[in-house]
């Protein structure tokens, strides 16, 4: 099993932490296991509560059903259904930025 370093950051929320996340675990789940409190609601990729923005790196969020192609191209990611596929940095708490 491969594990990646995922940096979660949001200056306004006081978050600047790096977690280890296996490539078969959702980023939200890994963050919670490591004591990081991130927003979530459905945990199924069907809403935008957990939205973040990918600053660097790559993720697999093929399980999501909410974001459109343009939002994905802009780097938005649903942490509840995103697996890291490389080391990455995610700006958290980005639900409002979607609209």
UniProtKB/Swiss-Prot annotation:
One of its GO terms (biological process) is electron transport chain. NCBIfam families: fdx_plant. CDD domains: fer2. The gene is petF. It is found in: Plastid, Chloroplast. Forms a complex with heterodimeric ferredoxin-thioredoxin reductase (FTR) and thioredoxin. The lineage of its organism: Eukaryota, Rhodophyta, Bangiophyceae, Cyanidiales, Cyanidiaceae. Residues 4-96 form the 2Fe-2S ferredoxin-type domain. This is Ferredoxin. Pfam families: Fer2. GO terms for molecular function: 2 iron, 2 sulfur cluster binding; electron transfer activity; metal ion binding. Binds 1 [2Fe-2S] cluster. [2Fe-2S] cluster binds at residues 42, 47, 50, 80. The keyword Transferase does not apply. It comes from the Eukaryota. Ferredoxins are iron-sulfur proteins that transfer electrons in a wide variety of metabolic reactions.
